[in-house]
Amino acid sequence: MILKNNFMRTVLLFIGFALINSVTLSSCGGGSDDPPPPNEANLAVTTDPANETVQPPALGPYNLKVTITSAMPPNGVKIEVSAKKDDGSNTVFFSTSVNRTTAVSDFSITGTPAATQCLVETKVTSLTKPTNVWSGSYRYSSK
């Protein structure tokens, strides 16, 4: 009789332990329910004036057209444009940053110093996938 009671007690303790563990472990979860990052084509961009070119000296206006030629990311893009003297001084005289959902964006670079070669840098970043970035530059001179 004592042996039977010890056996039953052991079985009941085992079942209780198993139930507690199953409830505890099932609430641990398997990780985050965050969706995977969106699958997005690399940004492809053209500029006018073209990337990596040197424009002849001109009086202005100094316009820049940025065209997204790849599929537009679902949340759009951030376009950053800056212009500075091309003398190593890093003094920026024009800077803008805009968010866009359209493929074509026009900019007018202002504040260009006279008789100076300038460097325009353009950076386009996906607002959906911030690691998806395109960068380019061109040079122009004012008369």
Residue ranges of each PLM-predicted region?
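Bacterial Sec-dependent N-terminal signal peptides
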Residues: 2-5, 10-12, 18-48
